[in-house]
Amino acid sequence: MTTGKLIDRFEGPSGRAVLEEVLLEQKLVLGNQDLARRLAEVGTLEEIAKDAVLITEDAEDSEVYFIITGHFQVKVHDREVATRGGGDHVGEMAALVPTAKRSATVLATEPSIVLKVSAADFKSIADAYPSVWRQVTRQLVDRLHQRNDMVLPAHQSSHVFIICSVEALPIARAIENNLEHDKFFVKTWTQGVFRASQYALESLEEQLDECDFAIAIAQPDDSVTMREETKNTPRDNVIFELGLFVGRLGRARTFLLEPRGDEVHLPSDLKGLTTIGYRLTKSEDQLPSSLSPACNQLRTIFNKLGPK
């Protein structure tokens, strides 16, 4: 699907006047009629279909595109970092720096029309109209600020999230207490993680971004029968959340605490995780001492790897 005949409005003798009028609204043009006329002379109009890629990250082309109509998504490493629409331009960095590759992918989110200007023509025009350089600098600073706003600051102290069932909360609290004098911020799912105004999954996604490590406490919460054999398993939500954290943090930062002597069945997808054993006790008074060796192992790993 393309914009069809819409491009005809900007082509030919009558369309040139319309194109120049639209270019006057460009952020790099700022109402300069001579500059708009010059861009219209050297540029080439192109139709861009919905979902078509205008610019590909790491590519070596260097044209500058002025968006006449439509809307585009800007993505870095497959993550959206900005959007651009009519009046915006994209691609100027590769035009200005001969050795620069494309820093982002630009994808049309609707049928669009752009004016393509070669790097040589763009630099020639910028030299003739110094206001272009000033506006390019301002735009680049604004975009840098936008990019920085999307980068999470590194933690000074490692954030640790504990995944567990309700039945395992005493164990989670004992781990938290064991690590309270270390430079770790330990959070269990009861500590304001699931707010009333949010769905549980959205709250978990926040923790995925915020945390540097995850500990899943596996204990025989449930029994399941598979192939006529009964096995002890953790609660379903523990397995689900463990999988989420493995996917985001990786196996090196996600740990499974298993009770010694009580085999807990896990899905085959989660095999290969770093497993730390602990001595399961029915007395909460004995939990701090029974978990101390496990906490020592965790402490060593957290200090070695540090915040992500």
UniProtKB/Swiss-Prot annotation:
GO CC annotation: what is one? cytoplasm
Q: Name the Gene Ontology molecular function terms of this record.
A: NADP+ nucleosidase activity; nucleotide binding
Coiled-coil ranges from the UniProt annotation: none
Q: Return the EC number.
A: 3.2.2.5
Q: Where are the residues of the annotated region TIR-like? A: 160-278
> Residues that bind a nucleoside 3',5'-cyclic phosphate, according to the entry?
54-143
SMART domains (alphabetical)? cNMP (SM00100)
Superkingdom assignment: Bacteria
Matches recorded under PROSITE patterns = CNMP_BINDING_3
Q: Where are the transmembrane segments?
A: none
Task: Give the GO terms filed under biological process for this record.
Answer: defense response to virus
UniProt-annotated location(s): Cytoplasm
Task: Check the record and name the SUPFAM superfamilies matching this protein.
Answer: cAMP-binding domain-like
Per its UniProt record, what InterPro entries does this chain match? CAP12/PCTIR_TIR_dom (IPR019302), cNMP-bd_dom (IPR000595), cNMP-bd_dom_sf (IPR018490), RmlC-like_jellyroll (IPR014710)
| Domains (record comment) | Has an N-terminal cyclic nucleotide-binding domain and a C-terminal Toll/interleukin-1 receptor-like domain (TIR) that probably has the NAD(+) hydrolase activity.
What does the record give as the function of this protein? Pycsar (pyrimidine cyclase system for antiphage resistance) provides immunity against bacteriophage. The pyrimidine cyclase (PycC) synthesizes cyclic nucleotides in response to infection; these serve as specific second messenger signals. The signals activate the adjacent effector, leading to bacterial cell death and abortive phage infection. A clade A Pycsar system.
In Swiss-Prot or TrEMBL terms, this protein is called Pycsar effector protein PaPycTIR
The species is: Pseudomonas aeruginosa
